[in-house]
Amino acid sequence: MRIKYYNHHLHSSYIILNSNLYGVPHKDLILAALVASGHRKSSEIPKEDIQKFASVLTPEDLDAVRKLSVILQIAESFDRSQSSVVTGIDCDVLGDSVIVKTQAEGDCSLEIKDALNASSEFKAAYGKNLEIL
């Protein structure tokens, strides 16, 4: 089996679904796998996955998956350069905006720019504007 970096979201989903994580309810594994598969930029949860698990998923589950997928996308962006430059974040909710203040050791402009690519998905999921400093 070959694993391409650009499909890591699909490979992560497969690994989560097919790993025998004892003590984790099956539904939680499904939700985690869907979060992993849906976190790529402009990526939605694959419809075939939703259909495959429709019998155990509620609309609230799918909403939670969408929200968590956006958070995972932003978190992954905070290590875009793979140099661990972002060491922490603080978040404040002010009115219709969520303001994320990065703590960094060095220039994190690449990470911020990449994370801001999720602004529209964040707005759709949370109904708030995303600002990253």
Listing of model-derived features with the role each one plays in the protein:
Residues 1-91:
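Divalent metal-dependent catalytic cores for phosphoryl transfer on phosphate-bearing substrates
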Residues 26, 132-133:
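Residue-level detector of family-conserved "landmark" positions at structurally sensitive sites
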Residues 78-132:
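Low-complexity, glycine/alanine/valine/leucine- and proline-rich hydrophobic stretches
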